[in-house]
């Protein structure tokens, strides 16, 4: 600091312009703050009018409770709010806004006009302010019950900020995304958007499951709803509901991911980690899952006052939230079988909310214990699937046979029978059924193409199966079950490896010693910042022990759990399954193909191979007719 500089108070205008840098980044930021105020006022319809991407004009009009004439000037003051009164109120805040600085920040960098009327008032009142003149002017106006806010010429008095704005289309895309997120968060509110005089979006209130599904489809696209699983699970004060996209509906970018905590759209690394972990075994490398999920918990269980934009949150029991999210999504994705993917629901049904072990139970250190082994869970009998075509409808039922997990030694030879010559009796045993009611989801094999693909016929049409990919997933799941039932054996190191850590990392290792031991590790603390690795899992004897332990400790300290060891083990099991699976160009007889189809129907995650590629696809009669221009 130079000797001639003196400490002085900043002017209110300059202070607000500096604060606006945190709150007002672009027109989308303004829209977010104004829309959240409308929702907090109890609005049931919100109209948004935009010109030039929101830079020239952004007008938000609602039918909420309105603001009294006396409170209008105060609404533009910094840290003035009706949401909280004391610090303790932050622990239970449910409103989207509460900091009381958005309108002051916006009015400091734009020309703002706010008109409002309460239900008890005989007339409306209007207040105007500009960035260079912070003194609001209040006057009577005509307006129905509710509030309208006009923001014109954004950043007109801060040219440096305006230079950083992107093209009109880019800014409008960001603004539209804000509206989409809020429209997903509040199904009970109608949203209507116009840009340069043209209607862009019109979403009416959605009060039932069908209307909600229709709104999600309008925002995320009909393809998402056709490839999404509805979930609704509640346990230990946490409820997760919404829709998760099937792994086959993944995206190259993370642009179709919506997560809400108590109705607030958030981007949280703990949530992202739990979702990524749940999709780990079924998503192709470099692809991103799709989901619209809502987490509900007690307001005092989450801190929303982490950042001025309120995009980040902090959970009081982060470990429990992480385990609940992972367990729920993992179970939902594991339960997807071919019959679930054949019938795309026209409307989203309400699901029962499983409790206890139905939703997945977790041990002391976060590992998941299913109610029964993965491959021992029989599917419910008499599953019905409709044709879904335009012709005469029909239904068929199929009761799959529960498969039994095999010991690890036997798992490598699961399909040894594939390589034996078939007799006439075996062929007769797989004869096609005489009635449609006996057709299983993946149907019955017709032929093999180039020794790679199985062609089968089911009630919908033609099924094509990647033989090696499907068998690889079956082998992989059985190896995982066998490993879980038999446990992990440790491999003592001839010369223990010494690991230099921080004291915090060493404390974490000591705290989780039993967890490491169950996974085949033996760690010994030699000093405040020194650790000895004496034993590692036998399957990971080729791994770099020091690096693996350090990475696991980093995860444990950040998330309270780690999937790195399991990821290494799964990679090895996947390699074993790949080598043990039936190879391409291996000619299979019809009974062998049918045996593979039946096992696919009884295996978790059989829709994707270990690398996330699809294992089968369906072509209905309508699809085939289009290829030959039939019916035109």
UniProtKB/Swiss-Prot annotation:
Q: Does the keyword DNA repair apply?
A: yes
Keyword DNA repair: yes or no? yes
Q: Which GO terms describe its cellular component?
A: mismatch repair complex
Q: Which SMART domains match?
A: DNA_mis_repair, MutL_C
- Gene Ontology molecular function terms on file: ATP binding; ATP hydrolysis activity; ATP-dependent DNA damage sensor activity; mismatched DNA binding
The Gene Ontology biological process terms listed for this entry are:
mismatch repair
Which Gene3D superfamilies does the protein's record reference?
A: 3.30.230.10, Histidine kinase-like ATPase, C-terminal domain, MutL, C-terminal domain, dimerisation subdomain, MutL, C-terminal domain, regulatory subdomain
Span-the-membrane segments of this chain are none
Q: What does the similarity note say?
A: Belongs to the DNA mismatch repair MutL/HexB family.
| Name recorded for this polypeptide | DNA mismatch repair protein MutL
Source organism (scientific name): Pseudomonas putida (strain GB-1)
């Amino acid at each position: 600091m130079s000797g001639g500089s003196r400490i002085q108070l900043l002017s209110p205008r300059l202070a607000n312009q500096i604060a606006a840098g945190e709150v007002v980044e672009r027109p989308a930021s303004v829209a977010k703050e104004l829309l959240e105020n409308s929702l907090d006022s109890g609005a049931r319809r919100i109209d948004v009018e935009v010109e030039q991407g929101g830079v020239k004009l952004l007008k938000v009009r609602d039918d909420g409770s309105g603001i009294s004439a006396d409170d209008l000037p105060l609404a533009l003051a910094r840290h003035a709010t009706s949401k909280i009164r004391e610090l303790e109120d932050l622990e239970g805040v449910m409103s989207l806004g509460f900091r009381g600085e958005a309108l002051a920040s916006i009015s400091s960098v734009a020309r703002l006009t706010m008109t409002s009327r309460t239900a008890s008032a005989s007339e409306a009142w209007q207040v105007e302010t500009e960035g260079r003149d912070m003194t609001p002017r209040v006057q009577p106006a005509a307006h129905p019950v509710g509030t309208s806010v006009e923001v014109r010429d954004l950043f007109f008095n801060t040219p440096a900020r305006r230079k950083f704005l992107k093209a009109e289309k880019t800014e409008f895309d960001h603004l539209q995304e804000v509206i989409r997120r809020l429209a997903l968060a509040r199904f009970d509110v109608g949203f209507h958007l116009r840009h340069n005089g043209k209607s862009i979006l019109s979403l009416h209130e959605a009060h039932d499951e069908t209307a909600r599904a229709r709104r999600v489809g309008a925002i995320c696209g009909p393809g998402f709803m056709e490839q999404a699983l509805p979930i609704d699970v509640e346990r230990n004060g946490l409820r997760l509901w919404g829709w998760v996209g099937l792994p086959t509906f993944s995206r190259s970018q993370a642009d179709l991911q919506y997560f809400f905590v108590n109705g607030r759209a958030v981007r949280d690394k703990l949530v992202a980690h739990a979702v990524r972990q749940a999709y780990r075994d079924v998503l192709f490398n470099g692809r991103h899952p799709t989901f619209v999920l809502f987490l509900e918990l007690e307001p005092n269980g989450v801190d929303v006052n982490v950042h001025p934009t309120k995009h980040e949150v902090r959970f009081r029991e982060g470990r429990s939230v992480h385990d609940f999210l992972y367990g729920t999504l993992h179970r939902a994705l594991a339960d997807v079988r071919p019959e679930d993917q054949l019938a795309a629901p026209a409307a989203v049904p309400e699901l029962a909310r499983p409790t206890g072990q139905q939703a997945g139970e977790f041990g002391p250190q976060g590992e998941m214990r299913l109610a029964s082994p993965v491959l021992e869970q029989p599917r419910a009998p008499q599953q019905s699937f409709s044709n879904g075509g335009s012709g005469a409808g029909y239904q068929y039922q199929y009761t799959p046979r529960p498969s039994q997990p095999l010991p690890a030694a036997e798992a490598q030879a699961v399909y040894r029978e594939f390589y034996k010559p078939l007799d006439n009796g075996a062929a007769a045993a797989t004869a096609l059924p005489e009635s449609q009611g006996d057709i299983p989801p993946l149907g019955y094999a017709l032929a093999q193409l180039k020794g790679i693909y199985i062609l089968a016929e089911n009630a919908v049409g033609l099924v094509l199966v990647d033989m090696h990919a499907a068998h690889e997933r079956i082998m992989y799941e059985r190896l995982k079950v066998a490993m879980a039932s038999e446990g992990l054996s440790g491999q003592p190191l001839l010369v223990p490896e010494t690991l230099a850590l921080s004291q915090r990392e060493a404390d974490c290792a000591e705290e989780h010693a039993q967890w490491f031991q169950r996974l085949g590790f033996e760690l010994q603390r030699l000093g405040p910042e020194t650790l000895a690795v004496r034993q590692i899992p036998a399957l990971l004897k080729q791994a770099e022990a020091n690096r693996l332990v350090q990475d696991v400790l980093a995860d444990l300290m950040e998330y309270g759990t780690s999937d790195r060891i399991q990821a290494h083990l799964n990679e090895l099991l996947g390699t074993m399954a790949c080598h043990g699976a039936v190879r391409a160009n291996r000619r299979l007889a019809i009974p062998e193909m049918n045996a593979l189809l039946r096992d696919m129907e009884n295996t978790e995650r059989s829709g994707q191979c270990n690398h996330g590629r699809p294992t089968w696809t369906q072509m209905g009669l309508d699809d085939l007719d289009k290829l030959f221009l039939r019916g035109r």
